[in-house]
Amino acid sequence: MKLISWNVNGLRACNGKGFQDFFRDVDADFFCIQETKMQGGQLDLEFEGYESYWDYAEKKGYSGTAIYAKHHPISVSYGLGVDEHDHEGRAVTLEMEDFYLVCVYVPNSQDGLRRLDYRMRWEDDFRAYVTRLATKKGVIICGDMNVAHNEIDLKNPATNHMSAGFSDEERAKMTELLGAGFVDSWRFQHPDEVKYSWWSYRMKARERNVGWRIDYFLVSENLKDRIESTDIHNDIFGSDHCPVELCIR
């Protein structure tokens, strides 16, 4: 079974930059999207053989998550069930027969870490949410988690120590999440490989491969042995992020 996750940085914009070609070529069982940046009815983008589930932000042109699924879920839920967090369209969860799939767009801590306090509350509530799910069946988490966990996960760790996405606090929360029973599937399969999933639009960062790995597939420990392959499609353009892939048995 193949799963894809992609922060498209605006689906309407990405749709004009090859999104549909990649969607059809990759032929995923589940295709998860972050930063749709749209409201219901703004873009009619359905694909034969797929159902789609959308969590829109109340603020127009902001955030938003979605899942295209070939397989009909048992149930669908939106958000974390915490009112403070559930107005920004940041999570869609599908309950399947033997796992939950959570598509998430984690809040950015912003320049000067001005939203870090909120990010810390989000992290604790999100970890509580997915660990509750994991008491019932396996969990697959995918999306833009807005953190490079270790120094290998970004080009310039020394100069980004206090930057959003590489602060000690954010990295520690990722460590806590993994410690709660989850596995970073890419790093599990590629312990020493350097590959990035996001590049700033500034300073020709993508051309020079000055990037960060902030897009993940995490799986609960009881699914670890089902990991077949992982990939980071850094040859696919259309966004400042590239798609990431997980195949499970």
Model-predicted regions and their roles:
Residues 1-47, 51, 57-63, 78, ...:
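N-terminal, active-site-proximal structural segment of metallo-dependent hydrolase catalytic domains
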Residues 37, 42-109:
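Structured beta-strand-rich core segments of catalytic domains in phosphoester-bond hydrolases
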Residues 60-75, 193, 205-225:
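Conserved beta strand-loop-helix elements of the APE1-like EEP
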